Regions:
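Surface-exposed, active-site-proximal loop segments in enzymatic domains
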Residues: 112-126
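N-terminal binding-site loop/beta-alpha segment at the start of enzyme catalytic domains
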Residues: 1-105, 111-114
Length: 127
């Protein structure tokens, strides 16, 4: 199993939408073939309803020709990255390979796990 997007995988993904996606929808960048649109995971309350919504939206986006997903550990208290993971599992069962999908993330943030603690300073100093 691939641990990330590859040229071969993203090319295969784009080929699935040949004749369906508009001309120029897919383009080469960073030695990958990426969709001109992506889906982000930044906004929303940290709750189960939003989690389910994000997971479903990511699955729908990938099935519709979007292979760029933006997320980060600090989005919705780590929940968005977990939603991306849940969506990737669903997509794998639908025949989409990890090597077909570009996941963009960020590093260097300290963030609570799941929700905002009552005392953030204490949380970070004790964790």
């Amino acid at each position: 199993m691939s641990h990330g997007a590859t040229k071969e995988g993203t090319t295969k993904y784009a080929a699935k939408f040949r004749g369906v996606a508009g001309e120029g929808h897919f383009r080469e960048a960073q030695d990958l073939v990426v969709s001109s649109l992506g889906i982000g995971t930044y906004l929303g309350q940290p709750n189960e309803d939003k989690d389910a919504g994000y997971t479903a939206a990511i699955v729908a986006a990938v099935q519709a020709g979007i292979n760029v997903i933006d997320t980060a550990i600090n989005y919705r208290f780590q929940r968005s990255e977990r939603n991306v993971g849940a969506a990737m599992k669903v997509l794998a069962n639908k025949g989409f390979g990890r090597e077909e999908i570009v996941v963009c993330t960020k590093g260097g943030y300290l963030t609570p796990d799941g929700s905002m603690p009552t005392d953030p300073n204490r949380y970070f100093f004790e964790e």
